[in-house]
Amino acid sequence: MSTVTFFNPYLCGPRKPRAPSAGEGGAEGAAAARARAASAPFLQIVPRGCLYDGERGLLKHNCALAPRMFFRDRPYVLSKDLVWPTLPPPAVPASTTERAPRAPAPSADLLFHMYDQAETVVSADSKELIHPGYRHRITPCGVVLRLFGRTADGASLCVNVFGQDAYFYCRYGDAQSLHDRLYRLSDTLELAPVFHVRVRRVQRCSIYGYGTRPFADLYLVACGNWHVLKKMGQCLLDEGVEVFEVGVSPLTRFLLDKKIPSFGWCRLRRWHARPAHGRLSTAELEVDCEVADVRGVDDVAWPLYRCLSFDIECLSGGGAFPVAENLDDVVIQISCVCYPVGGTEEQRAAFPVAERHLFTLGPCAPIPGVLVYEFPSEFELLCGFFTFFGRYAPEFVTGYNINNFDWRYLLTRAERVYRWPVAEYTRLRFGGRFCAYVPGGGGRQPGFRTAQTKVLITGTVVLDLYPVCMAKVSAPDYKLNTVCELYLGRQKEDLSYKELPRAFLSGDAGRARVGRYCVQDAVLVKELFEKLNYHYEAAAVARLARISLRKVIFEGQQIRIYTCLLEEAAARQMVVPTFRSGAQRGAAPGAGGGGGEETTYQGATVFEPTVGYHHAPVAVFDFASLYPSIIMAHNLCYSTWLRDDPGTPARPPETPARPPETPAAGPSGAAHAGGVPGATFRTPFRTPAGVPAAAAGGAGAGPPGGGAVSSASVGGRAAVSPSETPAEREPEPAPEDVFVVHVGQGVSYRFVRENVRASILSELLRRWLAQRRAVREAMRECEDETRRLLLDKEQLALKVTCNAFYGFTGFSQGMLPCLPVAASITTIGRDMLSRTSAYIEAHFAEPAFLARFFEPGDLPRADEPPPTVRVIYGDTDSVFVRFGGVRAGAIVARGEDLAAAVTEALFTEPVKLEFEKLFVALMMICKKRYIGRVFGSDALVMKGVDLVRKTACRFVKTVVRDVVELVFRDAAVAEAATRMSELTLEEMRRVGVPAGFHVLLQRLARARDDLFSGRVETAALVLSSVLSQDVSRYKQLNLPHLAVIRRLAARSEELPSVGDRVSYVLTAGPPDGRANAPNYELAEDPDYVAAHRVPIHAAKYFEQVVKAVTNTLYPVFPRGVVRRDRFLADLVPKRVYLGDEFKRHARPVEEEVCESERGGSGLLSSLDSSR
């Protein structure tokens, strides 16, 4: 079309733009607009379809006029001083050049809620307007902490805290020598010349090991330049100097030393308000204070915060999936949904900002309920979005996969394409950070991060729901549509990225359609945000661990435990050592710090299960918080571990990767009765009458106080500091005050008991568990729905953190690994499980014991077989107990009493065995794989079967579920399954397949018919695999999901990111292809298969059905069958399927009748081939 449909004052030269009037663009007038018109020129990129409907291509033009937007046919010049037309006017001027009324002098404490923090190093020559009373804190330089939050009356606030130093500890000969060495290091490392180091002697002992008194040569090294100090500490560590707590940031020091909640209410005793012209932040109120003036307040309530959910749409110039670095791949629309978080219901109802906003290139038809802002070019669109972001100033930003795509795309376009810095749109006018980056060069480090890309915006917390949903829900894929269906019960109106360009370029109505789609995504994310309430959960963890909210979001659980240990160690006048990275990776701590053989230790016990279909009550007992209770019961900790040499090691003893679970001989075998061989220990457990001494755990386990193994026994002897003398060591505790754990192979670890030194880990766990009980009690009494939600997230944070302690000590790449603690925990856990199993089998079937818990009517009559009790399975912290002849309802009623009897007989507090559930029928397949029906419920509990695996397609899951339902619901099928499991193959050849089993075979035949007849929709046949790393890093390239990615790339379609599940369908392949072609040759993208009607490979899918059913019904098949999948396939009635070219010559026939249904045994004629 030749008609211009959108007035672009830059691309349409003959037409003169109307200058904004005094009332347009907020406070700006014509003179201001003319002044900005002389701003630096910028590149305009706009799709031709925005000016000429339906046309493709881009228009590019260098423009010297000021960027602007159009809202309701009125132009607005985009500048730092713009008052956004649809937002409430700010309480303070947007520019520092305009003065605001002075804040009143502080006459009382200032109460505020803090949600985010930033740490900066400020030097004495800084241009920042700092009150003279705080100047000495930054001379020559010093750390300034910026605390962002809101006051009690809802005003945004920035608190500048002065006087917080960064520091670490180290052992050295004398202070002057250490001082001189640090300054020499600064010359070597070419560090910043402006800094001052302070060294003073302190009295502390190490948390790592029991046996030393406070060091006589320990010094605290403090510095106002945090970056310099961190490098100095690392250099000392690399040179072999014993250092402690290197890398702990000044913000962490502030939160721990002052007991400040990282997300919560605080109070300022003294403060000084900055005038408007001297403010560094864009907050309504900015104050300065000393570090000693900040106090924490115990209150979990939230003020009203602003949240923004957004989504972007892009247009590729070449028709492929958009790439931000390509000049022609432009951003065409951005949707924003503004809504409140926290506060009271009345405050949320009075939220003054409109909810839905759309930023679009070109003219757009009106969209009901959406404020539409139109822009002449991409640069102005980005400028408008970031200006809106700065004016709205949200405390929280959310979206779906915004870290890996949206933010990275926007920042790349702004900074690389247009060379336009966006840091000025943070909460700080200068010195803020607005960036997206991948730590460690893009590789994933398990246990440290929950998201690959980190997005840092000073004063704004970014909460991407994509990694949150991946961690919280099991789904075949994690597309927004799938997640919304799971959580919200509805799907979005989808618009493919191939259809999107045509709609956008078609005209105003098409852009409105794309806009509705774009806004819809942001709205769905907002609803997911409010449904998941992950922000409340993350805030509770941040308060508990005293770490920033962004660390909870982007870091793993290691940092949470580490900061808690730092706080508790400081309260006990202890320091936490810093180890070399080689030791953390599992390198043997040899004298040279070189690599050594990696050590392993025995993991949790998994009993060999009694495989089969158990049509009798099976009770499940498990230990409540097994590993935390072991730590508390036995006083295990870094600080209670008795080493051969109490001197602090230069690196930790060898800590391996997380151990595999250890198989045991079985519930009834010798290893089960006597515990794990070579893994006994001296224990305070009581040995009940009737239980063998070996099963009771460690009689004669070693000489008192003996058997300890130094770090030399696990890869290298720890070095003893030359400055430590025997006189500085604690005296050796008495033998009765030492708890010895023999972990096998001649290795033992010793720990002092609680009366000698209380375990730090135990103290933390006891405190948190008591706090969790108090919170749950408060929940029961709480009637306010919002407060109840906050309390629930708090108790969940306490639970998750408590359960993370074992992983913290046992993770070889962690921040403070410790083999003695981790190995001792698993050793004690294995013994507890073995002792529990032995006690149950020795006592539960005794008549006297049963009479204590059950009524005569619950047990068999005198003329019936006596009751039987047998442990059929055990896994880490739970045992499965099969009761024969006992009424199921009675077991449920007295289950807790049975568990309490075991606890009382075997264990000491806080160890507690609990009754979890009762299966009325259980199919035990193998280790970690079973299916059972729970008493009082129709629901089936499944573990490890294809029904709950993400890799299986929906069609296979449906067939397997139907088969399982038949086995557990249909009495005839259940009886046939039980009968078949009791037969041998030879017996079955003589008597035939049990009659009830044919119902199951008919279901398989129907599934085969559906596949070969093309009656299964493509969506039900989708398989998926995780893209765990970049495609180029795979050694095995012949994988189906990698083949799909290569096909997508060849067609220039959207490619998945690392961590995504890649979906694919197995197609029939070319007609002349191999019959047994590998899956990677047949894998294709599901959307491509559906769009082009590509036939699927029915035989391969039926093969998957048979294998999945075989794996699920593994215990049902006769004994002696080796190829069970082939055996099952031979049982299914045979059928020949005609191709399309033959179907018109065929006539329908009735369903075939299985030969064995007519009484014959011909069905088994081909079973010999399955042997």
Curated annotation (Swiss-Prot):
It is found in: Host nucleus. Its EC number is 2.7.7.7. Gene3D superfamilies: DNA polymerase family B, C-terminal domain, DNA Polymerase, chain B, domain 1, Helix hairpin bin, Palm domain of DNA polymerase, Ribonuclease H-like superfamily/Ribonuclease H. SUPFAM superfamilies: DNA/RNA polymerases (SSF56672), Ribonuclease H-like (SSF53098). Keywords: DNA replication, DNA-binding, DNA-directed DNA polymerase, Host nucleus, Nucleotidyltransferase, Transferase, Viral DNA replication. Residues 663-674, 709-725 have a biased composition (Low complexity). It catalyses: DNA(n) + a 2'-deoxyribonucleoside 5'-triphosphate = DNA(n+1) + diphosphate. One of its GO terms (biological process) is DNA-templated DNA replication. Residues 647-735, 1149-1171 are annotated as: Disordered. Residues 697-708 have a biased composition (Gly residues). It is an enzyme of class 2 (transferase). It comes from the Viruses. Belongs to the DNA polymerase type-B family. This is DNA polymerase catalytic subunit. It comes from Tupaiid herpesvirus (strain 2) (TuHV-2). The gene is DPOL.
